[in-house]
């Protein structure tokens, strides 16, 4: 499964960049790897005697064939039973819908998933885009009357007219979908941070469990003094980090089975509502992105420039002065803040790496080991917390520099994860941090979204259910940016 997707998306080289983690994963499970070869060895040694089909009569072979055909027909019929279901995990939608590799593999097996993946790669696939069937012309409710007094977050695109003027079926489906969507509206938080500088941080494997008053006081301060999104969820997308970035930065759902950000850059797709592009449109003086790992990992050098940023990373303008894994978030801040701190206006994006998995042996966990050594957790969990202390040090440094430059009160800082710390799964580490057995259907995806500015006088509790898809539209509203809310998968949390 992984090999097919990686190779078809140009990711073979990325696998070699993580060869140390791959080898560690294999050696830690060597017993199970050896067991995989036991059936093959058994067949080689005893197969000739136990599986001699030459003695089976034609009648017996026909019976076996008929049973196999019956099973195949039954399976096909079972797939079609729930074809009208709206459940994306129904048998029908898993088989005929957008390819969800992990779910399809679990339901139909590895070979079926690979066959579907390869066939769609070779022959293409047309998605079935469903439009909102709710009628537009209905009796106004009290909520709708209130909304008429507000302003819809839309732009001048006339999707009804565009639908009539195109013969392209795919474009027509998109226009119809956008036209059917209910827009977000201006609200009490519209323009709250208009004119502010913005620093957006996607923190590797970050979670709410990394926020601690004693271990990570700066992260704790930002959460407890800022917007507190109590029901925020971060899905585990198919391509982990880069798909998490895609959702965070575009407000769109990444396509399963491909590197969505990489493919979008390859196809020169425009993202007019990203903070990078919006900042350039407004004449922002400095629009930079940074990453403290290899510059072209996941093709970041292509997709971050495609959404409006001037990009620096290891091997492309950023030298941290040490060759370790993972690299230090603190050192990245120390090396980059001077690039923009004195600019009249700046829009900055960071993709951190200190929190990367492999917590029992990596450099960041070891660097801060003394600070967690007395905690009553397993070594893996202590390593995870130690790695996030490095992120906290980076944020402490950033806030101190902003305050010294007199820009803490007019800078909005947004920090969230790319995905939950799934490297802890095999050690049941997330449950250990939570203090109870974590539900793997929903609870494990609950996370923290830190949104804070030095100008905030008191925290704001937000109990609305939201996800990483909602970050961009929410920020766009709060920064007073012009955007069309119908064209994003996420929605403004307050709109």
Q: What do these predicted ranges mean?
A:
Residues 138-162, 322-328, 332-336:
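Basic, amphipathic N-terminal segments that precede the first structured/catalytic domain
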Residues 1-154:
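Transmembrane and membrane-interface helices of multi-pass
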Residues 36-37, 130, 150-180:
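Helix-hairpin-helix/helix-loop-helix acidic hairpins
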């Amino acid at each position: 499964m992984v090999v097919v997707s990686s190779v078809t998306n140009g990711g073979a080289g990325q696998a070699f960049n993580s060869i140390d983690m791959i080898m560690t994963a294999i050696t830690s499970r060597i017993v199970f790897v050896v067991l995989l070869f036991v059936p093959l060895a058994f067949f080689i040694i005893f197969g000739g005697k136990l599986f001699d089909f030459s003695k089976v009569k034609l009648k017996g072979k026909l019976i076996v064939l008929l049973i196999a055909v019956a099973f195949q027909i039954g399976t096909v019929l079972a797939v079609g039973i729930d074809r009208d279901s709206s459940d994306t995990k129904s048998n029908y939608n898993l088989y005929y819908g957008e390819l969800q590799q992990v779910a399809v593999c679990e339901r139909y097996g590895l070979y079926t998933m690979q066959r579907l993946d390869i066939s769609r790669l070779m022959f293409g696939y047309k998605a079935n885009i469903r439009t909102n069937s709710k009628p537009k012309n209905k009796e106004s409710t009290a909520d709708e009357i209130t909304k008429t007094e507000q302003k819809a977050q839309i732009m001048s695109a006339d999707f009804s007219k565009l639908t009539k003027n195109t013969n392209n079926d795919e474009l027509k489906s998109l226009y119809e979908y956008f036209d059917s969507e209910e827009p977000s509206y201006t609200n009490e938080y519209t323009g709250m941070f208009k004119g502010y500088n913005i620093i957006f941080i996607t923190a590797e494997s970050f979670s709410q469990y990394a926020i601690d008053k004693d271990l990570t006081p700066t992260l704790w301060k930002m959460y407890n003094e800022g917007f507190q999104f109590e029901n925020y969820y971060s899905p585990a997308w198919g391509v982990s980090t880069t798909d998490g970035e895609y959702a965070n930065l575009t407000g769109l759902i990444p396509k399963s089975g491909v590197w969505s950000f990489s493919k979008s850059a390859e196809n020169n797709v425009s993202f007019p509502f990203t903070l990078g592009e919006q900042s350039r449109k407004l004449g922002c003086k400095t629009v930079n992105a940074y990453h403290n790992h290899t510059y072209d990992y996941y093709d970041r050098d292509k997709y971050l420039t495609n959404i409006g940023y001037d990009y620096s990373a290891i091997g492309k303008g950023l030298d941290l002065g040490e060759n370790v894994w993972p690299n230090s978030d603190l050192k990245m801040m120390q090396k980059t803040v001077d690039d923009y701190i004195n600019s009249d206006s700046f829009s900055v994006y960071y993709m951190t790496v200190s929190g990367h998995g492999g917590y029992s042996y990596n450099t960041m966990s070891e660097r801060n080991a003394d600070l967690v050594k007395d905690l009553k957790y397993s070594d893996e969990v202590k390593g995870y917390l130690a790695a996030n202390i490095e992120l906290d040090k980076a944020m402490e440094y950033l806030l101190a520099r902003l305050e010294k430059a007199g820009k803490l009160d007019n800078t909005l800082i947004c920090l969230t994860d790319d995905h939950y710390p799934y490297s802890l799964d095999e050690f049941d580490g997330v449950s250990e941090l939570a203090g109870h057995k974590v539900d793997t259907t929903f609870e494990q995806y609950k996370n923290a979204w830190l949104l804070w500015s030095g100008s905030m006088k008191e925290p704001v509790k937000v109990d609305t259910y939201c996800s990483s898809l909602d970050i961009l539209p929410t920020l766009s509203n709060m920064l007073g940016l012009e955007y069309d809310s119908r064209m994003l998968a996420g929605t403004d949390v307050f709109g």
